[in-house]
Swiss-Prot record:
Role according to the record: Catalyzes the formation of the alpha-1,6-glucosidic linkages in glycogen by scission of a 1,4-alpha-linked oligosaccharide from growing alpha-1,4-glucan chains and the subsequent attachment of the oligosaccharide to the alpha-1,6 position.
Keywords: Carbohydrate metabolism, Glycogen biosynthesis, Glycogen metabolism, Glycosyltransferase, Transferase
EC assignment: 2.4.1.18
A GO molecular-function descriptor: hydrolase activity, hydrolyzing O-glycosyl compounds
One cellular component (GO) term of this entry: cytoplasm
A Pfam short name: Alpha-amylase_C
Known pathway: Glycan biosynthesis; glycogen biosynthesis
Organism: Vibrio cholerae serotype O1 (strain ATCC 39315 / El Tor Inaba N16961)
Domain of life: Bacteria
Protein name: 1,4-alpha-glucan branching enzyme GlgB
């Protein structure tokens, strides 16, 4: 019987290295090997020869030790704490720093588990070390893959060869390696082996700051320290209560606002140079960007992100995106990002089955798979997933100076039965449908954001009546600063679509949102969701002929700006777009050559400036003290009126006529004696309205109306909204 000799431990380790399956390279490579094995071991598969290079000393050739291995048996005559390797690749010499001489360059527990610190340590970080009086710069890589049997760093620098740079298994499920001399802009990925040694698809860095597009989807090294910010004045502005500020958001998709001459994307810098002056002119206070975190599928609009820490490279580098934010801030414009913590796509290079296990999602599809979106749901019951997401939110505030996040699809996270039949979901521990893990995550995230960035704001896109979304966590709420008022959007659009003849039968639809208008801190949103998938453009939602459609839209926008709540318009609303939004094109800028559309653009501009200038229109947006009905239930005329107030007692009267019938002598009761001065009329000539005669100034009369002793006799144009400012004299 033939006896097979068992390979030595050294040979076993070489076999593992050759299969990119070695988890403990620092025990076998570099200068820290057992003394009986030699002074230094190098792993350089494909090299012909390797020599040790120490400054001030003669080169020492290393002995070959198996295929790809080289060893220095006796180093007693050498003194060094830093060395290089002269590697002969088929006659071509390359001088390299050996990564395996840099031992213990990692991070403490708190740095790896505190969200505010994690993005300064995880992923690819540029660091500089001192060795023998010399500074050695390079990139330290840390990745969390607790169930992987092995992990290698691969990239253009090692010809994507997983054998070349095995990473060290560290504590807490983290793998690490430091690569000296690696420049910025280097492509890299991770090559992992699953729990049973099985090969996995090459993975992009979950913490990567920069990424390439199709087909490689590789992560790219990026140094956050380089960009020189110019927004100090903005960053140092006093902390203010956002609920009392005028907040007018311009929702924008970067790839389709405008295109270049040949239909190409504008990059972040080109976009900033054109967009910022436009936002200032139009009176918007903030731009809200649809998701810019790296996403492989452009048609997802960013709502299927893979690289949560990287602004998409479709439009430029992270520095270019910083320039965009910087320029906005220098012009007094805040930047809000759509943030997607609800789900992630199944792309093989992403988070899906990252280490060969469902590391970021629940393996049970009843909790881990979103059947509507064909994507995985983050498992918020796991601490590392919660930390990852909270760290990501903080990262955008700190590293890119953003001012807010709008959290997408909050309802889908709060309810375990969201969009599921009775047999497709698992109840919580109490038998209910609330997702306790999501609730806890939102509370933690909001507390962290407001603790570290007091001037920030968080906004929830939440479509249900879940209580306390924008209430502080110490009062039992989720802690968001604001919530989109989806009910107002749905009801008001449902009403305005009706023919004016029929609107009197739907009057309650218009007035009902005021019953709950102050139950949350609301943003009135006319978002991208309302102008896609056959829903038609806002203009073409309006009934009637061309004149009535345009007048309806003007009246509706005026009504919106008079209502309590912050304002959000999707790009193109101000143009009166006739087409639905198309992410493969650009807005219909040519429409502004027609007065019908130019008038709407001027109206939105003036509404924004009016909203900012009149504290009565914004200071108490989230406080019932700032709103009083003047005419609520005149369904037959389809006219509504209310007053908005500020803390100082200033008042603005808002009247909307939702029919094409003018009201020539319209008496309206008001509570105070004085004079009302016209501020804005959506039917005015400059907005391409009918310019129906209205009073510029009107004084109260001691004639009772609507239960009030004082009243005004007004002229109200057809399909129009009027704003009047009250004064005591």
């Amino acid at each position: 019987m033939k006896i097979t000799k068992k390979p030595s431990k050294v040979q076993q380790f070489y076999d593992q290295l050759a299969r990119a399956a070695f988890a403990d390279p620092f025990s076998f490579l570099g200068p820290y090997i057992p003394a009986e094995q030699g002074a230094l071991r190098v792993w350089m598969p494909g090299a012909d020869n390797v020599a040790l290079v120490v400054e001030g000393q003669a080169r020492v050739a290393l002995e070959r030790e198996g295929e790809g291995g080289f060893v220095l048996k006796d180093g007693r005559n050498l003194r060094f704490t830093h060395y290089q390797l002269a590697v002969d690749w088929a006659g071509t010499e390359q001088l390299l720093d050996d990564p395996y001489q840099y031992h213990g360059l990692y991070a403490e527990y708190e740095d790896l588990h505190t969200p505010k610190q994690m993005y300064h340590h995880m992923g690819a970080q540029f660091v500089t070390l001192e060795r023998d009086g010399k500074m050695v710069s390079g990139v330290r890589f840390l990745v969390y893959a607790p169930h992987a049997a092995a992990c290698s760093l691969i990239g253009a620098f090692n010809h994507w060869d997983g054998r070349r740079h095995p990473m060290q298994r560290l504590d807490y499920g983290i793998w690490g390696i430091f690569i000296p001399g690696l420049p910025e802009g280097t492509q890299y990925k991770f090559e992992l082996k699953g729990p049973h040694g099985e090969g996995l698809p090459h993975k992009a860095d979950p913490w990567g700051f920069y990424a390439e597009q199709y087909p490689s989807f590789a992560s790219v090294t990026y140094d956050h320290r380089r960009y020189q910010w110019q927004d100090t004045a903005w960053q140092q502005r006093p902390v203010t209560e956002k609920r009392k500020q005028a907040l007018s958001f311009y929702e924008l998709h970067v790839g389709s606002w405008k295109r270049g001459e040949n239909g190409e994307f504008l990059n972040y810098r080109e976009l900033a140079d054109q967009l910022v002056p436009y936002l200032v002119e139009m009176g918007y206070t903030h731009v809200e960007l649809m998701p810019v975190a790296e996403h492989p599928f452009y048609g997802s609009w960013g709502y299927q992100p893979v690289g949560l820490f990287a602004p998409t490279s479709r439009y430029g580098s992270p520095d270019d995106f910083k320039y965009f934010v910087d320029l906005c801030h220098q012009a007094g414009i805040g930047v809000v990002l759509d943030w997607v913590p609800a789900h992630f796509p199944s792309d093989s290079h992403g988070l899906a089955n990252f280490d060969g296990t469902p590391l970021f999602h629940d393996p049970d599809p009843r909790r881990g798979w979103h059947q509507d979106w064909n994507s995985y749901i983050y498992d918020l019951g796991r601490e590392h997933v919660r930390r990852f997401l909270v760290a990501n939110a903080l990262y955008w505030f700190e590293m890119f100076h953003i001012d807010g996040i709008r959290v997408d699809a909050v309802a889908s996270m709060l309810y375990l039965d969201y969009s599921r039949s009775h047999d497709q979901w698992i109840p919580n521990v109490d038998g209910g449908r609330e997702n306790y893990d999501a609730i806890a995550t939102f509370k933690w995230m909001n507390e962290e954001v407001y603790k570290h960035f007091p001037n920030a704001m968080t906004i929830a896109e939440e479509s249900t009546a879940f209580p306390g979304v924008s209430a502080p966590t110490f009062m039992g709420g989720l802690g968001f600063g604001f919530k989109w008022n989806m009910g107002w959007m749905h009801d008001s659009l449902s009403y305005i679509k009706e023919d004016p003849v029929h609107r009197k039968y739907h009057h309650n639809t218009l007035t009902f949102p005021l019953i709950y208008a102050f139950s949350e801190n609301y943003v009135l949103s006319l978002s991208h969701d309302e102008v896609v998938y056959g829903k038609r453009s806002l203009m073409y939602k309006m009934p009637g002929d061309e004149w009535q459609q345009t007048a309806n839209l003007r009246a509706y926008l005026g009504y919106m700006y008079g209502q309590p709540g912050k304002k959000l318009n999707f790009m193109g609303t101000e143009l009166g777009q006739t087409a639905e939004w198309d992410h493969d094109g650009q807005l219909q800028w040519f429409l502004t050559q027609f007065e019908r559309h130019a008038g709407i653009q001027r109206l939105v501009r003036d509404l924004n400036h009016l909203y900012q200038a009149q504290t009565a229109l914004h200071q108490l947006d989230c406080d019932p003290r700032g709103f009083e009905w003047r005419l609520q239930d005149n369904a037959d005329l389809s006219v509504i009126a209310h007053e908005r107030m500020d803390e100082a007692g200033n008042r603005v009267l808002v009247i909307t006529n939702f029919t094409p019938v003018p009201q020539q002598e319209f008496r309206l009761g008001v509570p105070k004696t004085g004079k009302y001065r016209l501020l804005l009329n959506t039917d005015a000539k400059q907005y391409n309205g009918s310019d129906y005669p209205v009073l510029q100034d009107v004084s109260t009369e001691a004639i009772s109306s609507e239960g009030l002793d004082q009243s005004l006799l007004l002229s109200v144009p057809p399909l129009a909204t009027l704003f009047y400012q009250w004064s005591a004299k």
